[in-house]
Amino acid sequence: MTDFRGEQGATGARESDESVQDKCGMPIAKRVPKERVFHGDTFIDEYEWLRDKESHDVQDYVAAQNRYCEQRMEPLKTLRSTLFDELKSHVQENDMSVPTRMDGYWYFVRTQEGQQYAVQCRVPIRSADDWDPPTIEIGVPIDGEQVVFDTNAEAQGHDFFRIGGMHISKDGRWMLYGTDTSGDERYDFRIRSLETGKELPEVFKGIGGACFTPDAQWVFYVKLDDAWRPYAVMRHRVGTPVTDDVEVYHEQDERFWVGIGLSFDERNLVIGTGSKTTTEVLLLSTDDPEGEFRAFIPREPDVEYDVSFSCFEGAGEHGEDIPLAVVYHNALNPNFEIDVIDMRSHEPPYRLGEGVRVAVGSPYGCEYGDEVEPGASGMPIGTPYSNPCNPAILQGAHGLGIEGISIHRHYVALQYRAESLTHIAVMTKDAAAEDFLAGRPWKFTELVPHALEDDWDVDESVDEINEERAEVWGALDQLAAAQGEGSAVHGVSRKAMTSSDGATADAMPGETRRLYSIGVGGNPSYDAPRMRYSFSSYTRPGELHDIDPATGEDRLLKRATVLGGFE
């Protein structure tokens, strides 16, 4: 808070607290010297007393500040109300999300006019191969719809309410959820039956996060220290007192925070620990929840990495699966790289850099770029970069940074950044397995939304847009075949086809580019045959699409509604 005691009046004399208070009516925090010693240095903190939120002095001071704020803002009351009403008039309050399949249910969110919070809902899938989201109308319940969590009802009686995480068991019977009713970001987690609505007696109070094991027999959760740092992971057997819980990991280094979750394939419990520049991943098989967590790769100073797991189904010499570890790291490149490890031929302890390099970022213009390529640090960041390990679409990219990869049962999605814009590239899982086993660069194709091909007109309906796309898919097929490296996605425009020098035609230096954001999202199921992605720009509302990497069919699932227009 600004302290006016150091200000001088027109005469040059130092003004007192009282004179400043009298002139503007602003409350001024009193000074209560408290000595604190850090590393041998003494520091006098005159406002340490403000840390005690339960103190009557602190509460009185905050109340006085709030009154002062209302007093000073009173002349703007009408304008504030006008701005609020104008912004609210553009928001469609009665709305819902596109259903997302997880295990045996389609999950979605409803929002209702006049309600402060969303309502979490679900409906059962129709069959194991049901991958088309059900058609659900705004405000109209669908057969079999179940309310999973009505935040409006849960928030009643609380001045503040926030959900701090929600994990539903694989069989859909149990929900582990956390709530914060004070605003201090410490959450109380409970276990609720989704069949009866009743809750188990155990409550995990004041924690940072939690997850089930796949069988919902165990809960792992993160404890917070006095500085709100997540520092320890606890193990709890469902149905037993929390006093019997066991600490399974304790982070001694105060620079590091800790998190717990399940790997994408749900075969491992994952502890992620990291500081601002260093990360480490520890794993424990979900088949042995009482076992010991072990580091996948021991932490190295100033090295960030993450690991996920997948497999190439039936791609082995005798039709067996090939288990994979997919490592994303910056140990050898400041703009990150992705390595895929065949876990049949590599054994722990693993090291960063082993396996097949699938995508490598540019070292140009980076602080440690010289360690990758001599002279790279002094080169402009937009210098075209090529690497023999990279897919053809990345060769010659400007300012290339690798942002991640996800390997599902039917497709592989690569996310990267070039020319300061985010990009997505996709390929089928079968094609990725062939390239991996052959030791050649993977043949990704960039996904370019149709919005980049047209005049950004958004007056058409979803059905009209999809009908127009259907008319051009056949032509794009022929174009893809004519381009040589042509397992192109139907949703990809002519601009995205790889040119002879490896650059994309819409990314040439000196051209005017539309600014947009695109990203993979809403794909929690490993088995889903289609990939969802989002797209938005400064002049176009957010859109959610899905695309079939095998056929290239691109569907617009939802576009955000902006009431009253936005031109």
Regions found by a protein language model. Name each.
Residues 312, 319-339, 397, 403-418:
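Loop/turn-rich, solvent-exposed surfaces of beta-rich toroidal or solenoidal domains
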Residues 111-118, 155-160, 179-188, 203-205, ...:
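A flexible loop/linker signature enriched in serine peptidases of the S9 family
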Residues 4-6, 12-73, 81-95:
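N-terminal pre-domain segments of enzymes
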Residues 126, 193-197, 237-241, 285-289, ...:
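Short loop/turn segments that connect beta-strands within beta-propeller blades
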Residues 104, 171-173, 215-217, 265-267, ...:
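Short coil/turn segments that connect the beta-strands within blades of beta-propeller domains
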Residues 56-167, 178, 257-318, 327, ...:
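Non-catalytic accessory segments flanking enzyme active sites
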Residues 146-210, 414:
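A conserved hydrophobic secondary-structure block that centers on an alpha-helix together
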